[in-house]
Regions:
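Positively charged n-region of N-terminal signal peptides that target proteins for export
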Residues: 1-4, 111
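Bacterial N-terminal signal peptides
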Residues: 6-15
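Mature catalytic domains of secreted/periplasmic carbohydrate-active enzymes
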Residues: 19-313
Length: 313
């Protein structure tokens, strides 16, 4: 009996070990993708943060890139000086981001009624502001400044209560980091930022909320090895489990993740799952300067959705 029990334990341990995803593209790809994502068809993508206060870009621009406009002195700089004054800084918008009418349960119920199967919340965009109490963003998160609420945590609970999958968008780089300022500091000098900030912060987010979907972004100035893509993807899969899935925005050299065409007609030939990402207008975040005709009508939206689903998305 003792020998049989020992044999069973050995077999069980081997099974557990073999189920672990190793930090190699071969192991990650052997793990594959969960069927639920292919079946889901419709998800909700939420861009809501400090950039939602000015909510401004050119008529065709991305409002969530507001901070970048201040860096390059485009028309957002003139807008800010005209409306808020020359001494007003982007950081001054944070206390104005209050979310006083926000009801996560109401949102989740609406998402459920829409037919969506999963929700993606921008946990941190390129401005570095976090919608959870990240220890790596002191004084620059939604619990310490702004609404004083854990947006990631509250929405995750509400969404899962409705039987939907919860996921997070996470920007790999930041415009505001004091360790490495994206688009300002040399791309190759990103090592310390990745090792001491990005990796521990991303692991903090995943460990705390166990998101089923991880959508990274802002990868394009560095490669997959610099972002430690293999290590992070395998760690994420081993941490969250078999329903977890990542996207493909990990830099040059990435070999895994669902494809993410942006404002496109979709993909017809691919060896991976894919999901087009877009706003109802030309911006993901609210752009008060965007004309109404930029927004898709209900008929246009349904027609576009049918085209994407018919193509396999």
């Amino acid at each position: 009996m003792k020998q049989i029990l020992t044999a069973l334990l050995i077999t069980f341990n081997i099974a557990i070990s073999s189920a672990q995803v190793l930090p190699t593209w071969e192991s990650i790809n052997e793990r594959g993708y969960p069927q639920w994502f292919t079946d889901a068809k419709l998800g909700i993508f939420i861009h809501w943060g400090v950039y939602s206060v000015p909510a401004y870009a050119s008529k065709e621009g991305y409002a969530e890139w507001y901070y970048r406009g201040l860096m390059t002195n485009d028309d957002r700089k003139a807008f800010q000086e005209r409306i808020y004054g020359k001494n007003f800084q982007y950081e001054d918008f944070a206390p104005m981001f209050r979310g006083e009418l926000w009801d996560p349960d109401e949102w989740a119920e609406l998402f459920k009624k829409s037919g969506a199967k999963y929700v993606l919340l921008v946990s941190k965009h390129h401005d570095g502001y976090c919608l959870w109490p990240s220890q790596y963003a002191p004084g620059w998160n939604s619990v310490e400044v702004g609404p004083h609420r854990d947006i990631c945590g509250e929405l995750s609970e509400a969404v899962r209560k409705q039987g939907l999958k919860m996921g997070f968008y996470y920007s790999l780089p930041e415009w505001t980091s004091t360790i490495h300022r994206w688009y300002v500091d040399p791309d190759e000098d990103i090592v310390d930022y990745v090792d001491t900030h990005m990796i521990p912060q991303l692991k903090e987010l995943i460990t705390r909320y166990q998101p089923t979907v991880l959508f990274t972004d802002g990868e394009w100035r560095n490669n997959a090895e610099q972002w430690h893509a293999r290590e992070l993807i395998s760690w994420y899969y081993n941490t969250v489990g078999e329903e977890a899935i990542v996207n493909d925005r990990w830099g040059d050299g990435q070999q895994h993740g669902f494809r993410t065409p942006e404002y496109s007609a979709g993909i017809t030939l691919t060896d991976r799952p894919w999901a087009e990402c877009r706003g109802l207008g030309r911006s993901f975040g609210l752009n008060r300067n965007e004309p109404l005709e930029n927004y898709m009508t209900s008929e246009e939206l349904i027609r576009h959705f049918c085209i994407l689903v018919a193509a396999g998305g």
